[in-house]
UniProtKB/Swiss-Prot annotation:
Residues 21-27 form a propeptide. Disulfide bonds: none annotated. The sequence shown here is derived from an EMBL/GenBank/DDBJ third party annotation (TPA) entry. Contains 4 disulfide bonds. The lineage of its organism: Eukaryota, Metazoa, Cnidaria, Anthozoa, Hexacorallia. GO terms for cellular component: extracellular region; nematocyst. Belongs to the Cnidaria small cysteine-rich protein (SCRiP) family. gamma subfamily. Induces neurotoxic symptoms on zebrafish. Has also been claimed to be implied in calcification, but tests on homolog proteins suggest that proteins of this family have a neurotoxic function and not a calcification function. This is Small cysteine-rich protein 1. Keywords: Cleavage on pair of basic residues, Disulfide bond, Nematocyst, Neurotoxin, Secreted, Signal, Toxin.
Amino acid sequence: MDVRFRLCLFLVILVIVANANVIKEPEKRFHPNLWRPPRCDWPHGVCSYIRDRCAPDTPFPCGPIFACPLPTNKCCCRRPYLPPWAGRR
């Protein structure tokens, strides 16, 4: 009985220690140096070729805020956006 209890306690402690980094991840998610832009997709905007103008229904270029999967594309948004760390004015 004592061996089973110690083994169970050891496994519980092992799981807690192994998941310690997972618990800290949400703090890192919005750090400006580690932030990755989300995909430029509906409802935010559309990806178009870099040298083309943005369409009339998506007039705002928002490249640093949203990313397109291809490096030859840029993101055109329906309204202007600010990155999460820029703060609202």
